[in-house]
């Protein structure tokens, strides 16, 4: 079934497509995101496909014991080790991913940190882990985390702004005073304190950051509801007996979403930046997790290895620039003056 767009939506889509920088940024961001989603197929220390003595194996999807390849241990083997390399070379063959390291694999054959080489394209960090593999996995984690935080904070912010703007009065007054006080709190310091009190984890970190990120959209949605509740079609719907929930989410919210959508790419930027800052300070993801903030810290601590700081700088600058360009293009496309 084809999606039929209204003339207004077609005009906005055409305006976005006419913005060459925004269109190119969206394509690059989607390509980067899709690539990171399949990180295990790009950077892994296990073969994608393995044939051994006439049997087929998928080590990237399933754990096989060493005994399946003539070994003695009932644990998964080191496919890059000497034992498996000799077995594969003699009795089979393997299809490897382009990068033969995952985010936690250590290259013991080279001193750490090691400069870029044919084996480690962007070098290794101070623990001997492949930098490019950690960048790919870290990008996926950062983007997925930012998307989850943006969606959750947008949902809370839209609901809070809708209630304040629709009902007004004491509800709006109390809500505004609370948001003013809450927004005035030193967010980064409180995030550090709260993150240090709980066990490090993605879920806890997402919940803690959600406490302070939901206020970003409240004022925008509130203003749209304050304006929309006095429009004629809303009064007509109220006269016909439509309830408050139907009025808010069926009639006023679609118009309020126009202003909300223009903020989403910038909220993604803020989420990525905050997560990177917390990881850099050591209060973010669990130790050992592939993260951009941890790479920033390694670049600071290993100035003799410039490839660490340069790599994470280019990655962060590229990611944030793409999101900003997308946000500017969306904002211009929804601008009624264009």
Predicted regions and their residues:
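Alpha-helical transmembrane segments of integral membrane proteins
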Residues: 124-338
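Gly/Trp-centered helix-boundary motif
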Residues: 1-154, 158, 162-163, 271, ...
């Amino acid at each position: 079934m084809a999606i039929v767009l209204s003339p207004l939506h077609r005009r906005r889509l055409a305006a976005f497509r006419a913005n060459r920088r925004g269109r190119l940024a969206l394509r690059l961001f989607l390509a980067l995101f899709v690539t990171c989603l399949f990180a295990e197929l790009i950077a892994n220390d296990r073969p994608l496909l393995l044939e051994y003595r006439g049997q087929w194996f998928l080590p990237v999807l399933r754990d096989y014991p060493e005994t399946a390849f003539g070994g003695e241990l009932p644990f998964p083997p080191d496919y890059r080790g000497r034992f498996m390399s000799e077995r594969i070379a003699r009795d089979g063959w393997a299809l490897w991913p382009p990068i033969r390291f995952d985010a936690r694999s250590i290259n013991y054959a080279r001193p750490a940190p090691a400069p870029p080489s044919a084996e480690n394209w962007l070098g290794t960090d101070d623990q001997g882990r492949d930098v490019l593999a950690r960048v790919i996995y870290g990008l996926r984690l950062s983007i997925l985390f930012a998307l989850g935080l943006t969606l959750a904070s947008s949902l809370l912010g839209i609901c809070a702004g809708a209630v304040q703007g629709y009902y007004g009065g004491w509800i709006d007054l109390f809500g505004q005073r609370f948001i003013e006080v809450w927004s005035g709190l030193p967010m980064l310091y409180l995030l550090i304190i709260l993150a240090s009190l709980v066990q490090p984890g993605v879920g806890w970190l997402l919940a803690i950051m959600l406490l302070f990120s939901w206020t970003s959209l409240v004022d925008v949605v509130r203003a749209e509801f304050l304006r929309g509740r006095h429009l004629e079609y809303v009064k007509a719907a109220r006269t016909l007996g439509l309830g408050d929930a139907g009025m808010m989410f069926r009639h006023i919210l679609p118009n309020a979403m126009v202003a909300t959508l223009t903020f989403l790419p910038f909220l993604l930027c803020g989420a990525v930046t905050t997560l990177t800052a917390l990881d850099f300070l050591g209060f973010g993801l669990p130790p050992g997790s592939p993260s951009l903030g941890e790479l920033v810290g390694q670049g600071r601590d290993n100035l003799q290895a410039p490839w660490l700081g340069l790599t994470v700088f280019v990655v962060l600058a590229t990611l944030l620039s793409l999101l900003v360009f997308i946000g500017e293009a969306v904002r211009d496309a929804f601008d009624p003056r264009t």
